[in-house]
Every structure is written in C-alpha cells, then in structure tokens.
C-alpha cells in the first residue's frame, strides 16, 4: 500500500520538461487529454518559458519515494479566486498512484496554498 509520508510535491523545473513531455505524449495519457495533439519539444519549452514566472499558474512534479510519478497544474480561472487543476501520472505508475497524487495535490492546494475552490474537467471516457 502506498504511504502518504513518502509522497511530496516540488515545483516543475526546466530539467523535468523532457520527462513530463514523454508522459504527456504517451498514447495512454494523450488520449485522455482535452487537447490530444502530440506536443513538440520546442513547443513544450516555449510553453514553459511563457508560464514559469506567472503567479496565476503553478506547476508541480509529484514524487513518491523521491522518484517522479506525475505532473500537476493549478491555473487561476480569470475574474475569479478559483483555480482549475489538471494532472496525470506517468504511464507505468504503480496502481493507486493517481489517487495518492490527488490526495497530496488537493491537500497542498487547500492547506498550503490557501486556495478556496479547485475545479477540474473530466472526460466521460476517462
């Protein structure tokens, strides 16, 4: 059983971009995304450069036993105090990792960041 004590979030860094892009472009992940196009490395780097210093967008790597397991974003909804979140786990993650990621991420959002509302989109087939 996965233990929350071994899980943590850290900010997404430039060194994580290739790994996260590989996860994001994997067929099992991409098919469950709102925008399912394959993303190029140059587009991914450009996205990071445009967004890395924005205070209304937060990007994290979820780690379990100090190993990267997933990606999480919190993006402020315009004209609101609410945020939308998105996440995915690496394609070969251990069973239960997604639930643990969700628990850790929402705890971080509400108890550390002080967010009051977090929304997400769910596709019917996911």
What is each residue range found by the language model?
Residues 1-38:
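A short, well-structured alpha-helix characteristic of acyl/acetyltransferase catalytic modules
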Residues 19, 43-46, 100, 104:
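Alpha-helical elements of Rossmann-like donor-binding domains used by nucleotide-donor carbohydrate transfer enzymes
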Residues 37-93:
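Acetyl-CoA-dependent GNAT
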Residues 95-109:
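Conserved acetyl-CoA-binding loop-helix of GNAT-fold acetyltransferases
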Residues 112:
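C-terminal active-site-capping segments
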């Amino acid at each position: 059983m996965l233990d929350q004590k071994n899980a943590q979030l850290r900010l997404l860094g430039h060194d994580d971009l290739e790994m996260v892009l590989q996860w994001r472009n994997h067929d099992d992940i991409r098919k469950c995304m709102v925008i399912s196009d394959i993303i190029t490395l140059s587009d991914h780097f450009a996205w990071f450069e445009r967004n890395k210093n924005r205070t209304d967008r937060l990007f994290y790597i979820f780690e379990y036993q100090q190993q990267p397991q997933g990606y999480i974003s919190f993006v402020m909804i315009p004209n609101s105090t609410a945020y939308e979140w998105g996440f995915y786990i690496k394609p070969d993650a251990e069973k239960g990792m997604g639930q643990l990621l969700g628990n850790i991420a929402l705890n971080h959002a509400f108890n550390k960041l002080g967010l009051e509302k977090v929304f997400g989109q769910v596709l019917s087939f996911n």
